[in-house]
Amino acid sequence: MDPRYGAQPMPPRRSPSPGHPVQPGYQLDDNPFDDGRYGQYGPSSQHLAMPGHDPHGRLPTPSDHLSLNAAQSVDNLAGYGPPSGGDYAINPEAHHDAYYNQPYEPRPQHQGYDQGYEQDYDVPDNRPMLPHQHSDVPSEQYQDPPQQGGGIQRRKTVKQFALYRGNLVFDCRVPPLLLQQNPHGERDEFTHMRYSAATCDPNDFHDHDFTLRQRLFSKPRHTELFIVVTMYNEDEILFARTMTGVFKNIEYMCNRPNSKTWGKDAWKKIVVCVVSDGRSKINPRTRALLAGMGVYQEGIAKQHVNDKAVTAHIYEYTTQTHLQIKNNVVQLVHRRQPVQMLFCLKEKNAKKINSHRWFFNAFGRVLDPNICVLLDAGTRPGGSSIYHLWKAFDLEPMCGGACGEIKAMLGTGGRYLLNPLVAAQNFEYKMSNILDKPLESAFGFISVLPGAFSAYRYVALQNDKNGKGPLEKYFLGETLHGGSEAGLFESNMYLAEDRILCFELVTKRNCHWILQYVKSATGETDVPDTVTELVLQRRRWLNGSFFAAIYAIVHFLDFLRSDHTFLRKFAFFIEFIFNTINMIFAWFAIGNFFLVFKILTTSLGDDTLLGRTGEILGVVFTWLYGVFLITCFVLSLGNRPAGSGRLYTAMCWFWAIIMIYLMFAAVFISVKAIIADVNDENGFNISDIFKNKVFYMLIISLMSTYGIWLIASLIMLDPWHMVTSFAQYMLLTPTFTNVLNVYAFCNTHDVSWGTKGDDKVEELPSVNTKDGTGKTDLPDEGDLDAQYQREVAVFAQKFVEVKSAPTPSQLQERQMDYYRGVRTGVVLLWMVTNFGLAAIVLSSAGLDRISTKEDKEAEQLSRSNIYMSIVLWSVAGLSAFKFIGAMWFLVVRMFRGV
C-alpha cells in the first residue's frame, strides 16, 4: 500500500502495491469526479485508468523501454465499462493528485534506472498508453532515403490516430537519453510530451475544446502562478538567462516548507509559458535548447488539420532539466526541480501583443491562474523576485498589478559601465526606481508596469459581461496596428499598450484596484550599447508614452467610474497634475535647453567674465548648435539610424562638448559672482553668498537637484550609480533631449514595432481525418535519441557568426543608405550656406557681437547697402548678358536665313 495512507483499506479493484506507489501518470479528463456517481467501477465511463503496476511485485519498467504511442486517441471515450487492458482500476474518490504524481524526491539511481529490471517485462510497441477498444493500432514503417553527407537516417512510422475532442492532440514519448538523466515514473508527465495543434484564434481556444495538461489530472491542478516569457528571435543565451532566473525562483518557492501556499510541491502550482512569435522567426539555437529540455520535438507539428490552418503549435512537458551559462555556452543541468512548461510556437509573426493574447485569453482562460507574471526573453529575474511579486498580491488583496526594479545589465565587475551609453541608461533606470516608481506607488497608480518584468492579478484584468474592461482595451492595440482605419494618435498610443492596461485597470468600473512597486523584486535586462539601437528603442518608448499620457489626462474623469475612496481619487488628481506638468516640460525640452545654453554662453561674453573670448566662443557654439540640430531633423526625416551611425555618434560627442561648456559656464559665472561679493567694499558675510542672485539661480538650484538624487540614493541604500554613472548621464543629457526627442517626433508616422517581417517558412505536413480518425507519420522511437543528440549539439558550442554574402535586398538597402547620406549632405550644405549668407548680411546670429567697430548700426547699414547693390546690379548684369546673346542670335539668323 502507499505508505502515505497508513493502514487504510484499499479501495475496490485496486491491486496491492509492492511497496512503491502506483504512478499511472495523469488521467485525461477535466473533472475531479468527487461525487461518486459512477458506481463500482469509479469514473471509468468517462475517466480512464492506466496500467502502470506489475501484479508480481516487480519494479516499474525502465524508462528506456517504454513504448511510444504518440498518436493514441483519447477521444469519444464515453460508454466504456471497466478497463480491460489494465490489472487494476483506480478510484479518484480515494486518492488525490499527489498520489498519481508523487512529490519530487530525487534519490540516487544507477545509469539507466535498471534496478531490479526484468527483461520479460518489456511492453510491446503496439500496446496503448490508455485502455482502448482497439488497442492494436495499425502502423506502417518506412525509412527516408539516406541523407547525403552522413546525416542521420530518419525513420518514421505511419500511425493511426483519432481526434481528441475534435482536435489533433498527441502524447509523444521523450527521448530515452533524456529520461535516463532524470527521475520519472512508469508513464507520467516526465516521460511524455503533449502536442496540440491549435486551429483557432486565441480568443476561441477554450470554446473549441482545447485544454491543457493541468486540467487533465484526476484532480486538476490549481495554477497559482502563471509565468509567460515572450520572445521573437532571441538567441539561446538571452533565453537561458531568463529561464535560469525563473528556475531559481521556482526552487526558492519549493524550499519554503513553512509557507501555506508553497513548499515541496510548489512546482505543481506554477506553469511557465514560453510564447515564440512566429515559426519562421525563432532562433534555431533557442529551439534546440527547448528540445534539450524535452519541451520541443521536431517532426510532429502539422500545417493543416482537416484543411484548417494551424495557428499555434503547443507543446507541454514537465521538465527536470534546468540551464546554466558557462563561458557564454548554455549547458543542461539534469535532476533538478520539476517545472511545468508550456511552449507555444505561433505559426505566424503577429507581434508581442498577440503573444499576450494567447497567454491571457487562450491559456489563462483554461488554467484560471491567480497571478500572472510577464517577462521578456533576456530579462533575468532575481533569485526570489517572482516570489516577492507574488507576496505583494498576497499581502494586499486589492493589488491588481505590481512591478519590480528593472536593472541595467552591467557585466562582470561592471565592465559594461565603460560604455557611456550603458552608464547613462543605468543612471536613468536607477533614479526612476528610486524616485519615480516609489512616488507613483504611494499614490496607488503607476503610469507603466514594464512588460519586461511585471505581474497582474488575473481576475482584475477580466472584462465585464459586456466584454468591456482592461484586456479589451489592451488588445485593441493589436487590431489598430493591423488595420487601415486606425488613427495616428491611437496607433502611437498603443506602442505603449502597457500604459493603457495600467490606466484601465485602476479605473475599472465599480472596482478599486491599485498598482504597487516592489523594490525587493528585481529584473536585470541588457540595454542598447550603440547610438543607433538606442534611437530606435526610444522612438517607440517616447512616442508611446507621450500619446498614452495624453490619453490618460484626457480620460481622467474615468476615475470617477471606479469604486475608489474619495481620498484615493483626490490622490490620483494630485498625481495627474504632477504628470501633466512633467509632460509640458517634456514638450518644451528642446526650447528650454537652447534658452539655457544661449543665456549662459551670452553671459560669458561680459567684460567681467571672458570678455571677447567668451563672445567668440558663444558665436561659434551657437552656429554649431544650429548646424547639429538641423542635422538631427534632416536625419530623422529621411535616414535610417542604422545607415547613419557615424553621424549620430558625432552628434553625441558634440552635445557632450556643449554640456561640458555649459557646466563650466555655470560654475565660472557663480565663482566670479562670489569673488565680487568677497571684494565688496562694504564687507563680506557668508550669508551674502546665498543672497547673490547668480549663485542662488545657478548653483543652489542645480545642487538642490543633485543633492536630492544623492540623498534619496543613500536612503534607498543604493548610491553607487552616483559614483559610476552620474558623469556619463550628465554628458549625454543633451543627446537624450535633442537627438532622441527629435527622432521620435519626426517619426510619429512609424507605428511599427520593428519585428514584423516575412513569414516564409518550411511547409509542414498536413493531416485529414474521416469520422474522426486518420493517419500521420511521426518520428520513430529508434530515432528519438539521435534527434535529441543532434539538437543538443546545436547549442553545445559557442555561436560563431558566419558572414554570408549580402542578399540582393541588403545590397539595395545599402545603396539606399548611400543615396540618403548624399542627400543629407546636400540638404545640410544648402541650408547652412543660405543661413550663413543671411546672418552675415544682417549681422545676426551673434555676428554683431564680435564686430570691433564702435558704430555697429552704421556698419550694419553699410553692409546692407553693399549687399543690395551687389544683388541688384548682378541681376541687371545677368539680364544684360542674356540680352546681348539674344541680339547676337538675331544677327546670325538674319545672315543664315533660317
Curated annotation (Swiss-Prot):
Bilayer topology term: Multi-pass membrane protein
Q: Biased-composition ranges for Pro residues?
A: 9-21
Q: Where is this region: Disordered?
A: 1-154
For this UniProt record, the keywords arranged alphabetically read as follows: Cell membrane, Cell wall biogenesis/degradation, Glycoprotein, Glycosyltransferase, Membrane, Transferase, Transmembrane, Transmembrane helix, Virulence
* A GO MF term: chitin synthase activity
Q: So which residues have sugars stuck on them?
A: N685
> Catalytic activity, per the record?
[(1->4)-N-acetyl-beta-D-glucosaminyl](n) + UDP-N-acetyl-alpha-D-glucosamine = [(1->4)-N-acetyl-beta-D-glucosaminyl](n+1) + UDP + H(+)
**Main localization of the protein described in the UniProt heading:** membrane
User: Main EC class of this protein?
Assistant: transferase
Localization, per the record, is: Cell membrane
Q: Where is the composition biased (Polar residues)?
A: 64-75, 136-146
Which Pfam families does this UniProt record tie to the protein?
Answer: Chitin_synth_1, Chitin_synth_1N
Specify whether Cell membrane is a keyword of the entry.
Answer: yes
Q: Which GO terms describe its cellular component?
A: cell septum; plasma membrane
Q: What induces it?
A: Exhibits lower expression levels in hyphae than in germinating conidia. Expression is increased in the absence of chitin synthase CHS2.
Transmembrane stretches in the record are 441-461, 540-560, 570-590, 616-636, 651-671, 697-717, 726-746, 825-845, 870-890
User: Which GO terms fall under biological process for this protein?
Assistant: cell wall organization; chitin biosynthetic process
- Provide the E.C. number(s) assigned to this enzyme: 2.4.1.16
Q: What does this protein do?
A: Polymerizes chitin, a structural polymer of the cell wall and septum, by transferring the sugar moiety of UDP-GlcNAc to the non-reducing end of the growing chitin polymer. Shows additive effects in septum formation with CHS2, CHS3A, CHS4, CHS5, CHS6 and CHS7. Regulates mycelial growth and conidiation. Involved in virulence and mediates mycotoxin deoxinivalenol (DON) biosynthesis via the regulation of the expression of TRI4, TRI5 and TRI6.
Q: Family assignment?
A: Belongs to the chitin synthase family. Class I subfamily.
By its UniProt entry, which PANTHER family does this protein fall under? CHITIN SYNTHASE (PTHR22914), CHITIN SYNTHASE 1 (PTHR22914:SF9)
Q: Would you tell me the protein name for this molecule?
A: Chitin synthase 1
State the organism named in the record. Answer: Gibberella zeae (strain ATCC MYA-4620 / CBS 123657 / FGSC 9075 / NRRL 31084 / PH-1)
